[in-house]
């Protein structure tokens, strides 16, 4: 999972 995955 990429760090951008934290953006929901």
Swiss-Prot record:
Something else known: On the 2D-gel the determined pI of this unknown protein is: 7.0, its MW is: 57.2 kDa.
What protein name applies here?
Unknown protein from spot 907 of 2D-PAGE of etiolated coleoptile
Please tell me the species this chain comes from: Zea mays (Maize)
């Amino acid at each position: 999972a990429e760090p951008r995955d934290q953006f929901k």
